[in-house]
């Protein structure tokens, strides 16, 4: 793990993601942003498959928090946010993988634009067989993953609403935009 305070904290919540978590973490570990500039916090949300074993393979490179039972995505993300040391927070879902410049570009943009509250990246959709379907413009169809926030602003709006089981990202964005737009 890092010896200095990280610039970015990446939060990954994982519930029964043994099939995808390794690829996700490998993509996060091979970033152009130096590894001592970010931390990866994985919240294992009470997985009953081999997700804990997969996470153990990365134990030297990630910080793992384990929920003793499934608490849900919003609660797990919030737990990661509360643990995060960095001033910038980005959520990446366990079944996602990111470009090698992902953290570098997002961090650089937000760091160079103090008047901007958050920054999102476009994303690509693939089907179950890894066939590329389309590139999505995040300004038209934003999702919860891939948005770099300032940690203090997430804390100020109360983070994710843990009563939401679906669309927690949309609800968070609505509250965020009301306060910061």
Task: Provide a role label for each language-model segment.
Residues 1-27:
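N-proximal low-complexity "stem/linker" segments adjacent to membrane-targeting elements
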Residues 6-9, 39, 171:
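Cell-envelope/extracellular polymer assembly enzymes that use nucleotide-activated donors
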Residues 26-37:
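Short, acidic, metal-binding catalytic loop of nucleotide-sugar glycosyltransferases
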Residues 44-53, 69, 93:
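A conserved acidic beta->alpha catalytic loop
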Residues 67-84:
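Glycine-rich, basic loop-to-helix element that forms the pyrophosphate-binding segment
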Residues 89:
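Short aromatic/hydrophobic "clamp" motif used to bind/position activated sugar donors
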Residues 101-133:
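Conserved donor NDP-sugar-binding/catalytic core segment of glycosyltransferases
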Residues 166-172:
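Acidic donor-binding loop at a coil-to-helix junction in glycosyltransferase catalytic cores
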């Amino acid at each position: 793990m890092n010896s200095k305070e990280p610039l970015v904290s990446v939060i990954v919540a994982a519930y029964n993601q043994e099939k995808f978590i390794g690829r996700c973490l490998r993509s996060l570990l091979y970033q152009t942003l130096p590894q001592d500039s970010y931390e990866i916090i994985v919240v294992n949300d009470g997985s009953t498959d081999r997700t804990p074993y997969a996470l153990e393979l990365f134990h030297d490179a990630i910080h793992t928090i384990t929920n003793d039972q499934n608490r849900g995505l919003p609660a797990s993300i919030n737990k990661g946010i509360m643990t995060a040391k960095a001033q910038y927070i980005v959520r990446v879902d366990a079944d996602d993988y990111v470009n090698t410049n992902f953290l570098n570009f997002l961090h650089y943009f937000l760091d160079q634009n103090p008047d901007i509250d958050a920054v999102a990246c476009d994303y690509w959709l693939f089907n179950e067989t890894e066939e590329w379907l389309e590139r999505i413009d995040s300004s038209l169809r934003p999702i919860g993953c891939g948005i770099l926030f300032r940690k203090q602003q997430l804390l100020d709006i109360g983070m994710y609403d843990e009563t939401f089981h679906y669309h927690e990202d949309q609800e968070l964005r609505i509250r965020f935009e009301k306060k910061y737009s």
